[in-house]
Amino acid sequence: MPKKFQGENTKSAVARARKAEAKAVSDGKRQKEIEDAYWQDDDKHVARKGQRKEDKEKKRLEQLERKKESQRLLDEEDSKMKAKPTKPAAPSKVTRAEIEETLCKEEEHKATTEKPKTHLEMPLEENVNRRVLEEGEVEARTVEDAIAALSVGKELDRHPERRMKAAFAAFEEINMPLLKQENPNMRLSQLKHLLKKEWMKSPENPMNQQHAMYNSH
């Protein structure tokens, strides 16, 4: 009986060859996909990087343009301000009351400066033949001198208002500090009102002196 052929089966070899070829094709295709994906990712990265750079440059140019526009507006406004003539300052308004007050002060000053001095305001020349003592006594060499001295005293008593201003000033100088010390919480107007009330009943008031003199007669 003859031996069987020990060689390779042709069909099996063909199948294996086809399988190996299919595997090689599949592996090559997969490798190509991997490489394509790699290069595609790299392209995307490059594209994103380029886009970021482009956006950054665009923002820089926009900021530069805005700065230029702002500077242009400032320069334009500055030119307008320099070209515009400055208006003179408007004079401050004066009220009618202020005008009247100024006129009254001027009239008072004029009346004070132009007012002729009376015999009471004129300095008295010393008369060796007649002098009035502090106690109110009159020293005279003759009867005529005594009558003249008494006449002057009567003239002063007849017009006490002429001595009011000086007497009140002296009264205020002495008593105002005392009132301030006694009433530290009062305003100046209140202190002056209180001082006036004290003055009206003070024996230093020439008007009160006149009444006292009349009552003594």
Swiss-Prot record:
Disordered: region residues: 1-128
Q: Which GO terms describe its molecular function?
A: transcription coactivator activity
Q: Which residues form a coiled coil?
A: 46-82
Q: Which PANTHER family match?
A: COILED-COIL DOMAIN-CONTAINING PROTEIN 124
Q: Where is this chain compositionally biased, Basic and acidic residues type? A: 18-45, 52-74, 95-128
What protein am I looking at?
Coiled-coil domain-containing protein 124-A
Give the record's GO CC terms.
Answer: centrosome; cytoplasm; midbody; nucleus
Q: What domain of life?
A: Eukaryota
- What does the record note on quaternary structure? Associates with translationally inactive ribosomes in the nonrotated state.
Please list the GO biological process terms of this entry: cell division; transcription by RNA polymerase II
Tell me yes or no: is Cell cycle among this UniProt entry's keywords.
yes
Family that this chain belongs to:
Belongs to the CCDC124 family.
What keywords appear on the UniProt entry? Cell cycle, Cell division, Coiled coil, Cytoplasm, Cytoskeleton
Report the function annotation for this chain. Answer: Ribosome-binding protein involved in ribosome hibernation: associates with translationally inactive ribosomes and stabilizes the nonrotated conformation of the 80S ribosome, thereby promoting ribosome preservation and storage.
State the organism named in the record: Xenopus laevis
Pfam families in the record, alphabetically?
Answer: Ccdc124
